[in-house]
UniProtKB/Swiss-Prot annotation:
Gene Ontology molecular function terms on file: toxin activity
Keyword line: Disulfide bond, Knottin, Secreted, Signal, Toxin
Name of the protein this chain belongs to: U3-lycotoxin-Ls1o
Pfam families per the UniProt record, alphabetical: Toxin_35 (PF10530)
Domain notes: The presence of a 'disulfide through disulfide knot' structurally defines this protein as a knottin.
SS bond list: 48-63, 55-72, 62-87, 74-85
Annotated signal sequence range: 1-20
One annotated Gene Ontology cellular component of this protein: extracellular region
Pro-peptide region(s): 21-44
Tissues where this protein is expressed: Expressed by the venom gland.
Species name: Lycosa singoriensis
Record PROSITE patterns: SPIDER_CSTX (PS60029)
Family membership: Belongs to the neurotoxin 19 (CSTX) family. 01 subfamily.
Compartments reported by the entry: Secreted
Length: 115
């Protein structure tokens, strides 16, 4: 009986050690993948398309505003057959940014009063 107990403890110890090594290998692979994604994102972030400029070459290249990323909006001008795409900020996001700015300003006034 002691032999079975000793063998069981040894087996559990070896299993936990091997699973810990496998998790370390997976974590290392995830870190390497994350670093490569960050490098790609930094490279892509340098070449953003400003608001109201043509974004038909890359529809995901619009710049960020203060809080949100602009969206590439495509439309057909009146009487035209060619599609035109420009980076624009949706109205609901514009209003949310204005509200956030006012809330931030109001919070500063409250801090000034009670600060």
């Amino acid at each position: 009986m002691k032999f079975v107990l000793l063998f069981g403890v040894l087996l559990v110890t070896l299993f936990s050690y091997s699973s810990a090594e496998m998790l370390d290998d997976f974590d290392q692979a995830d870190e390497d993948e994350l670093l490569s994604l960050i490098e790609k994102e930094e490279a892509r972030a340098k070449e953003c398309t400003p608001r109201f400029y043509d974004c038909s070459h890359d529809r995901h290249s619009c710049c960020r505003s203060e809080l949100f990323k602009d969206v590439c909006t495509c439309f057909y001008p009146e009487g035209g057959d060619n599609e035109v795409c420009t980076c624009q900020q949706p109205k609901h996001l514009k209003y949310m940014e204005k509200a956030a700015g006012k809330a931030k300003k109001f919070g500063g006034k409250i801090r000034k009063w009670f600060g």
